[in-house]
C-alpha cells in the first residue's frame, strides 16, 4: 500500500532518494497483535501522515515536522533506527495550537486507513434531519481505520479521540476511501463481498450497500467528481457504480 498527497502529480515523480524511515517499535505492547505494517495514508492537504505500526496501533504524524526531522538528519546512517525513529511522545512538547503526534489503539488488526476533510457547504444527503450529533467545521480532519473484525472507527486527527464506531461489515475491512468533494462520504470494501457507503455528516449512518462481487473486495476508488465508484476483488472483475 502506498499513498501520495493529493497535490503531488504522479507523472512528475522521478527516481528519488530516501530521506528517512519510520520504524515500528520492536517490543510488543501488552501482548497485542503482531508487527503488521500494512497500510499508510496522507491527509488530503499533506498535513498529516498515518501508518499502521502493528500491535493494533496507528501513528498519526504531523508531516511537516516529520519531514523537517528527516532533512535535519540527512540521509546518512539511514539504517540507524535511533537517529530517525520518531519519538513516541507528542513532538510539540505540549504546546497548544500546534499539530501533535498521536498513538491510536484501534482495538484490532488495522487493514486500511483513509483521511477525510470537511467542506461545510457540502450538506448531508439526509436533508430532512435537522439535528446531528456532530457538526464538522471547515478545518475538520478525520481518520478512518478499517479493522480485522469488520468495524470501522472514525477518529479526530487533531485530538486523537474516537468519534464514531461503524458496525455492519461481517468480515475484514480491506479498503477505505473518502469522496474527494469534501462531503465526508466514506466507502468501505470488505471480505464479506460488499461495499458500504457511509455519510459521516449524518453521524455515520449507512446510506447503501453495494453488491456485485462474487468474492472478497480488495480495493475501491472514487472518480475525481465523486459521482462514480469502482472496486476490484478476488473475482478478477471491476465493478463500477454510479452514486449520484
Model region roles, listed by residue range:
Residues 1-39, 65-99, 120-133:
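Intrinsically disordered, low-complexity acidic/Ser/Thr/Pro-rich linker and tail segments
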Residues 58-63, 152-155, 176, 195-199, ...:
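WD40-repeat beta-propellers
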